[in-house]
Amino acid sequence: MKHRIGRVETQIQREVDDILLKDVNDPRVKGVTITGVKLTGDLQHATIFYSILDDAPDKVEAAQTGLDKASGLIRREVGQRIRLFKVPEIEFAQDKSVQYGARIDQLINEVRRKNLE
């Protein structure tokens, strides 16, 4: 069962990324990248993680609002593209691991600079 959940998560990620590129015309979601999908064990709820290039708070909030507004369209399109008994409810969440990784890189570079001095 876990293998199936992983396959469905990957397929949903691929489809949502494609839907955002081709079908959603909202300028607030331009530059949004889908980084992962987490499904519940019963496949009823999906949390879709995204990152955005410009991580300014107002841009992140606008992207979240745009994704929330487009969630009905995205859910319908996912249901048409993927054969599932029931299409999961979709919730979007910002993926903070990208920011965390950038902060780690910044700290490593600072340590290297201090060691060179």
UniProtKB/Swiss-Prot annotation:
Q: A single GO CC term, please?
A: cytosol
- Provide a GO biological process annotation: maturation of SSU-rRNA
What the entry lists under Gene3D superfamilies is as follows: 3.30.300.20
Q: Which UniProt keywords apply?
A: Cytoplasm, Ribosome biogenesis
Single Gene Ontology MF annotation: ribosomal small subunit binding
**Location(s), subcellular:** Cytoplasm
One Pfam family name is RBFA
On subunit structure and binding partners, the annotation says: Monomer. Binds 30S ribosomal subunits, but not 50S ribosomal subunits or 70S ribosomes.
Q: What is the protein's known function?
A: One of several proteins that assist in the late maturation steps of the functional core of the 30S ribosomal subunit. Associates with free 30S ribosomal subunits (but not with 30S subunits that are part of 70S ribosomes or polysomes). Required for efficient processing of 16S rRNA. May interact with the 5'-terminal helix region of 16S rRNA.
- PANTHER family, alphabetically? RIBOSOME-BINDING FACTOR A, CHLOROPLASTIC-RELATED
Note the HAMAP family from the entry.
Answer: RbfA (MF_00003)
Q: Which family does it belong to?
A: Belongs to the RbfA family.
Q: What is the name attached to this protein's record? A: Ribosome-binding factor A
